[in-house]
Amino acid sequence: MDHRDTNTNMEALREVLRYKNEVAGHGFLFDDGDLVWREEDDATWRRLYDVVNALISSKRMQRVLYMDLSITKGEGHLLFVDLQGTKNRLYKEPRFRRHLILIEDFLAYPR
């Protein structure tokens, strides 16, 4: 993946998180439209992108993850939740995958 792809994907991820925060009321990076964590050179976004990338298990899951991802910030951890299943039988009985990631671990991701 070249640098342009990464930037495009990070921008798409930003849009997803803006939507999730403003419309669905989840997310941890935005508070009244402003970034809560500010870092130089988008380091937080790069690490967030790496974490989300690590959660994607296949091309099919990528669509589901981006559509149904929520991220919440708790006491010392981030909780990533993604919905398994698309418009099939799982759609009627969805299963959620939860990924708990310590903020210390998140901040330790390579820049």
UniProtKB/Swiss-Prot annotation:
Stated role: Plays an essential role for the viral pathogenicity.
Name of the protein described by the UniProt record: Non-virion protein
Source domain of life: Viruses
Organism: Infectious hematopoietic necrosis virus (strain Round Butte)
Pfam families reported in the protein's UniProt record: Rhabdo_NV
InterPro entries: Rhabd_NV
Protein family per UniProt: Belongs to the novirhabdovirus NV protein family.
